[in-house]
């Protein structure tokens, strides 16, 4: 027993001595860390909570949160994870992701192919970046030749990654260009994901209408591990400016064409990304349930109303449901199992007259009305990732003479309303209630090749209305 204790003490002493000299057992598991988009990658702390195969969907969802102003940025980030800093759109409105369609085989020697046919003629490439995983290569190949010198963190190791781009045709392959990435990292630090700007290569391929390209990733001094040829796959992000996005029905032409998607056959996001999306949707539903018909408020101009039928025949307050009085709420707390019907509002005659006068003056005037669009209602929910619905609003109401300043009439609309009121010229309609200011909407969706795309569509939400 005494001998065993002595051996244990000797082992612990040797272990502590190694730690004091800067040596430690190899307990490191290569994590995943995204570096800033550049030609030189520096080391950083590993992030084992991020899985390599999540990178494309997580990267695109992070960009969606970034450019849409979503509050879900923190929800999608796992503890300790670090995502790349945003690349400016530079006047663009589109971000396309392309995942490697096929990993390397013994015949192609590690060639990763990309199908870029989703790029349209109207999309001008602003920048393009190739992201590829080299964690195993760096962690395996960078060994310390002199253990005593490796204790100094200032010593850096260098490794060069070569990239060769190929245009793939049916009968032959044509070299598109050569690139290299110089990896610089301190000893014992981890570099897992690298990035390389490939803007000029993709512009050249698009100009020549060559949309099937391949990348061969090699190292001059070390052979790539076989696992790196298959998993995780590299991916490409393309920032573009779609010149046709402001044309009439552009949102329909770019989204409605994906009707070949069928339920259950489309691509799926990773589980933690889907959970983050569902949490955000539950928050939106919980904050929007108290509409005027449920909280005993008179409907205002922000909410929907119908134009059908004569104005005098409408009785919008007849079936409004009120909140139960205080006594009723106390009774409901005492009898949780009992079912109580909502009470109907009982207005006196003076209140009803005041409400009718308010309804006659305000809702008839030009104003913004509430409209919520659910993509499931129009059959687009299969390929739209986020948002599943949005507040579009619409403009409706009269622009009668005299028009108040609150309706913001144009000079032409003012003259037109005067001519119509005087009746000098017959058949002149009153000015129209139209959107004055509108805002854009970011939509994250799958394209026809099941790649994740982010587009910022202009003029999707009405901010204010005016008479024109």
Curated annotation (Swiss-Prot):
One Pfam short name: TGF_beta
SUPFAM superfamilies, per the entry: Cystine-knot cytokines
Cell compartment(s), UniProt: Secreted
Residues cleaved off as propeptide: 23-358
UniProt biased composition (Polar residues): 340-349
Biased segments, Basic residues type: 329-339
Location, primary (coarse class): secreted
Superkingdom of the source species: Eukaryota
The UniProt record lists the keyword Disulfide bond: yes
Disulphide-bridged cysteine pairs: 366-433, 395-465, 399-467
Disordered: annotated span: 29-53, 314-349
Annotated knockout phenotype: Adult mice lacking BMP3 have increased bone mass. Targeted loss of BMP3 results also in increased differentiation of early osteoblasts precursors into mature osteoblasts and further supports a role of BMP3 in regulating adult bone mass.
GO annotations of cellular component type: extracellular space
A GO molecular-function annotation: BMP receptor binding
Residues with glycosylation annotation: 115, 139, 171, 216, 459
Leader sequence segment: 1-22
Record has Ribosomal protein as a keyword: no
Role of this protein: Negatively regulates bone density. Antagonizes the ability of certain osteogenic BMPs to induce osteoprogenitor differentiation and ossification.
PANTHER family: BONE MORPHOGENETIC PROTEIN 3, TGF-BETA FAMILY
Oligomer status and interactors: Homodimer; disulfide-linked.
Family label: Belongs to the TGF-beta family.
Protein's recorded name: Bone morphogenetic protein 3
Originating organism: Mus musculus (Mouse)
